Amino acid sequence: WGEQEASILVPGDIVSIKLGDIVPADARIDQSGLTGESLPVTKNPGDEVFSGSTCKTGTLTLNKGIVGMTGDGVNDAPALKTLHGLQAPESTSLNLPNDKELSEIAEQAK
């Protein structure tokens, strides 16, 4: 193994990533920094990982045929694409027995 520039990666390359390393290309790790989860997300063999993810424990080996997109094709922010498609609900109701009374109190407090 030797260190190389991420820019020379092509689909199908084998990459070894150790504790604290940044994933240099989309591949099949911990992506909590990209997705916003408060705890690291455990990845298992065959799971997808994204460029910018960080290896938190153990080691990760991207096997031959696993590196996906590189360069301009890398999906830098999968969470952003997901969020752009979401809309906040008009209102949220917990369907509590006193929901109507709580709504009236909230309206009066405005």
Curated annotation (Swiss-Prot):
Biased segments, Basic and acidic residues type: 98-110
EC number: 7.1.2.1
Keyword Glycosyltransferase among record annotations: no
Lipid bilayer topology: Multi-pass membrane protein
Gene3D superfamilies, A to Z: Calcium-transporting ATPase, cytoplasmic transduction domain A (2.70.150.10), HAD superfamily/HAD-like (3.40.50.1000)
Chain positions covered by the region annotation Disordered: 88-110
The record's account of how the chain is modified after translation: The N-terminus is blocked.
Entry keyword set: ATP-binding, Cell membrane, Hydrogen ion transport, Ion transport, Magnesium, Membrane, Metal-binding, Nucleotide-binding, Translocase, Transmembrane, Transport
Catalytic activity reported: ATP + H2O + H(+)(in) = ADP + phosphate + 2 H(+)(out)
Sequence positions that bind Mg(2+): 72, 76
MF (Gene Ontology): ATP binding; metal ion binding; P-type proton-exporting transporter activity
Compartmental location: Cell membrane
Keyword Mitochondrion listed: no
GO cellular component terms, A-Z: plasma membrane
GO biological process entries: proton transmembrane transport
PANTHER family xref list: CALCIUM-TRANSPORTING ATPASE
Protein family according to the UniProt entry: Belongs to the cation transport ATPase (P-type) (TC 3.A.3) family. Type IIIA subfamily.
UniProt function note: The plasma membrane ATPase of plants and fungi is a hydrogen ion pump. The proton gradient it generates drives the active transport of nutrients by H(+)-symport. The resulting external acidification and/or internal alkinization may mediate growth responses.
Protein name: Plasma membrane ATPase
Organism the protein comes from: Avena sativa
Organismal lineage: Eukaryota, Viridiplantae, Streptophyta, Embryophyta, Tracheophyta
